[in-house]
Amino acid sequence: MKKNERIRKNIEFRRVYRRGKSYSNSLLVLYVFKNNNNVDTSRVGISVSKKVGNSVVRSRVKRLISESYRLNCSNIKEKYDLVFVARNKSKDKTYKEIEGSVTNLLKRAGLYN
């Protein structure tokens, strides 16, 4: 993902958490906020708590989520801020299960074309 497609600052994460709508399943929680700024692309942030595991496990989960988003981002509506929060169950899952969870949440949010 390019730098302008990522949510990096704490204030941006908090805005999505407070004002956005949430969708969840057993592996992930998705927060969606309609971004009315002059940004033409959707931005994404990924959050994995220390409850999920050590740094190796957390990084693996982040990589799986970001890769599944990257491969499906061409099918996603633009001008949204998205934050994926990994749940504890996601640490043992395969790429296919994480990808299915990501696409399921995007479809439920109405962002998947």
From Swiss-Prot:
Source domain of life: Bacteria
Catalytic activity as recorded in UniProt: Endonucleolytic cleavage of RNA, removing 5'-extranucleotides from tRNA precursor
GO molecular function: 3'-tRNA processing endoribonuclease activity; ribonuclease P activity; tRNA binding
Entry EC no(s): 3.1.26.5
Keyword tags: Endonuclease, Hydrolase, Nuclease, RNA-binding, tRNA processing
Enzyme class of the recorded protein, top EC level: hydrolase
GO aspect biological process, one term: tRNA 5'-leader removal
Gene Ontology CC: one annotated term: ribonuclease P complex
InterPro entries membership: Ribosomal_Su5_D2-typ_SF, Ribsml_uS5_D2-typ_fold_subgr, RNase_P
Self-association state and partner proteins as the record states: Consists of a catalytic RNA component (M1 or rnpB) and a protein subunit.
Family statement: Belongs to the RnpA family.
Role played: RNaseP catalyzes the removal of the 5'-leader sequence from pre-tRNA to produce the mature 5'-terminus. It can also cleave other RNA substrates such as 4.5S RNA. The protein component plays an auxiliary but essential role in vivo by binding to the 5'-leader sequence and broadening the substrate specificity of the ribozyme.
UniProt-recorded name of the protein: Ribonuclease P protein component
Organism: Clostridium novyi (strain NT)
Taxonomic classification: Bacteria, Bacillati, Bacillota, Clostridia, Eubacteriales
Gene name of the record: rnpA
